[in-house]
A protein has these predicted regions:
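Acidic, PIN/NYN-like endoribonuclease modules and their adjacent C-terminal/linker elements
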Residues: 69-99
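A beta-strand edge to alpha-helix "cap/lid" segment located at domain peripheries
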Residues: 61-62
Length: 99
C-alpha cells in the first residue's frame, strides 16, 4: 500500500503549528504531508467506537494513539512508522521505529 494517513493526523499538524503561532509552517507541513500520503482516511463513528473499546480495554494506549490505531485497524492498515512506543501494546499493529 502507498503511504497513508488520516484526517486526525492532518488536524494534529494544524493544531501543533497553530499553537506555535507558525501558521506559515502549518500550511507548508500540511501540504507536504498530503503530497507524501496520497491516501487520507476519514475518521468515522466506527473509528471512535473502536478507539473507545481500545482505551477502555486497558490495552496501554492513550486516547490519541487509540484513535490512530482504530482508523488503521478499520482500514486494514497494519504497519505504522512512528517514534511512539505506545503502539507496541497492540499485537495487530507493527511499529517501524523512526529512532
Amino acid at each position: 500500500m502507498e503511504a497513508c494517513t488520516s484526517t486526525e493526523v492532518l488536524q494534529e499538524i494544524l493544531y501543533r503549528y497553530a499553537g506555535l503561532r507558525r501558521l506559515d509552517l502549518a500550511a507548508e507541513v500540511y501540504d507536504l504531508f498530503v503530497q507524501m500520503c496520497p491516501v487520507v482516511f476519514p475518521v468515522t463513528l466506527a473509528d471512535t467506537d473502536r478507539a473507545r473499546k481500545l482505551v477502555t480495554g486497558r490495552r496501554g494506549l492513550g486516547v490519541r494513539d487509540a484513535m490512530h490505531a482504530a482508523v488503521m485497524l478499520n482500514n486494514e492498515v497494519r504497519v505504522i512508522a512512528t517514534f511512539d512506543t505506545g503502539f507496541d501494546a497492540l499485537a495487530e499493529i507493527e511499529r517501524l521505529s523512526l529512532a
